[in-house]
Amino acid sequence: MKKLFLDANVLFSAAWREDSGLWRLGKLPKAKLLTSGYAVEEARRNLDDDEQKRRLTMFLSKIEIVPDCPDQILPVKLAEKDLPILQAAIGHRADFLVTGDHRHFGALFGKNVGGVRIISPADVMKRFD
């Protein structure tokens, strides 16, 4: 079973729209979903209404929330707000970091960083669906 660490923007997007295809991630039979408390709080902070927050809570019921790993050394430079995401993915030995953040992770897409391959949600569905 592969461990998929979900970035805050994936959590946010799943909660934003009731019909988001990201809900399919929770049904992948060969994947274990992880995220961190930091990612959850970032997603929650950016949601506007109670219905979206309710959907986030429902989506999180399919995901293991792991501790942050602030002492994890990173082999790459990232924006300050993205450091805890990659640190937790590496620290918890995720196979993949799933993110839609092309602005900050774009140059790293498809690459292994500290043992974690950075991919988009669409790439996950191609690999696992």
Residue ranges and their predicted role:
Residues 57-77:
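Acidic catalytic patch
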Residues 76, 83, 103-129:
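Acidic, PIN/NYN-like endoribonuclease modules and their adjacent C-terminal/linker elements
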Residues 1-19:
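Metal-dependent nucleic-acid phosphoesterase active-site entry motif
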Residues 6, 18-48:
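PIN/NYN-family metal-dependent endoribonuclease catalytic core
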Residues 80-97:
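Acidic, metal-associated active-site segment
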